[in-house]
Amino acid sequence: MSDRQAALDMALKQIEKQFGKGSIMKLGEQAERRISTISSGSLALDVALGVGGYPRGRVIEIYGPESSGKTTVSLHAIAEVQRQGGQAAFIDAEHAMDPVYAQKLGVNIDELLLSQPDTGEQGLEIAEALVRSGAVDIIVIDSVAALVPKAEIEGDMGDSHVGLQARLMSQALRKLSGAINKSKTIAIFINQIREKVGVMFGNPETTPGGRALKFYSTVRLEVRRAEQLKQGNDIVGNKTKVKVVKNKVAPPFRVAEVDIMYGEGISREGEILDMASELDIVQKSGAWYSYNEERLGQGRENSKQFLKENTDLREEIAFFVREHHGIGENSGVEDTEDSTRQD
């Protein structure tokens, strides 16, 4: 062994002794690790994410216009974590959490940790404490725009506080990103949309809270309503598009189309029916849908209702859809990048 190699080995041993095992390794060793994921609660979104769900130990940003379904998407993830026996927390900075609606989406409100902070600093400190405990599987912050700095709350109306919130988010994410990665917590930040003044060319839309969240996010999802869903003359929900704008663990720019039904959330039957029809697992002839020569119903809404009443058949079709896309129940791909990387 050369003197250079011996010196390097000694340095590596010293680093591991001081900072712990795994604090430094060769990239090839890192690549052998697989990404652990938790389902988003939507089959279409799991497929669009490319790894079968939200990657653990990462920052996720979900943004979009008002009433587009951002909180609904997040609550489905919480319900899925709880279904698997995990612990979830919700930082309600907007003070708008509806426990009745959350319960309808499958959230166990008796077990959900809820905080309604007075200031942005308080909300982020609570989030940090929960993440560092290592006992929380998912934490949702709703929303970044509502994380108002203490100086702004205590100041007078009309006072200028330029860049305060951006600095707050930048500092918080610098502290949080490493802890999130080590604890394997999924941190979902819900964000709103603002319009930049005076933009003549390009997209005038931006998200509040500065650039830090864009950099630290492993996945960024844009949620937008596409069209209204009607049953007869009644509007019963919205067809919603969820676009994966950024993805560090799989190819980005995939789009998931889901039905968000009023009072019910994401329609599992609707997304399974659409995806199975595209793959010809479910056959469509005129208005009729059929599976293995068994008719599911005439029209999309009737077929959805049939699958809702026949859960075994629904899950059988879902299994074939998952199998085709290669995501399985416990999917994962090779993890080749550090979540704290900002490029």
UniProtKB/Swiss-Prot annotation:
Keywords, sorted A to Z: ATP-binding, Cytoplasm, DNA damage, DNA recombination, DNA repair, DNA-binding, Nucleotide-binding, SOS response
**Gene3D superfamilies cross-referenced by the UniProt entry:** P-loop containing nucleotide triphosphate hydrolases (3.40.50.300)
User: Primary place of residence?
Assistant: cytoplasm
Q: Does the keyword DNA repair apply?
A: yes
One GO molecular-function entry: ATP hydrolysis activity
Residues recorded as binding ATP, renumbered to this chain, are: G64, P65, E66, S67, S68, G69, K70, T71
Q: Name one GO biological process term.
A: SOS response
Q: Which GO terms describe its cellular component?
A: cytosol
Give the UniProt subcellular location, in the record's own words: Cytoplasm
Q: Which InterPro entries match?
A: AAA+_ATPase (IPR003593), DNA_recomb/repair_RecA (IPR013765), DNA_recomb/repair_RecA_CS (IPR020584), P-loop_NTPase (IPR027417), RecA-like_C (IPR049261), RecA-like_N (IPR049428), RecA_ATP-bd (IPR020588), RecA_C_sf (IPR023400)
Similarity annotation:
Belongs to the RecA family.
Q: What does this protein do?
A: Can catalyze the hydrolysis of ATP in the presence of single-stranded DNA, the ATP-dependent uptake of single-stranded DNA by duplex DNA, and the ATP-dependent hybridization of homologous single-stranded DNAs. It interacts with LexA causing its activation and leading to its autocatalytic cleavage.
Which protein is depicted? Protein RecA
State the organism of origin. Bacillus mycoides (strain KBAB4) (Bacillus weihenstephanensis)
What is the organism lineage in this UniProt record?
Bacteria, Bacillati, Bacillota, Bacilli, Bacillales
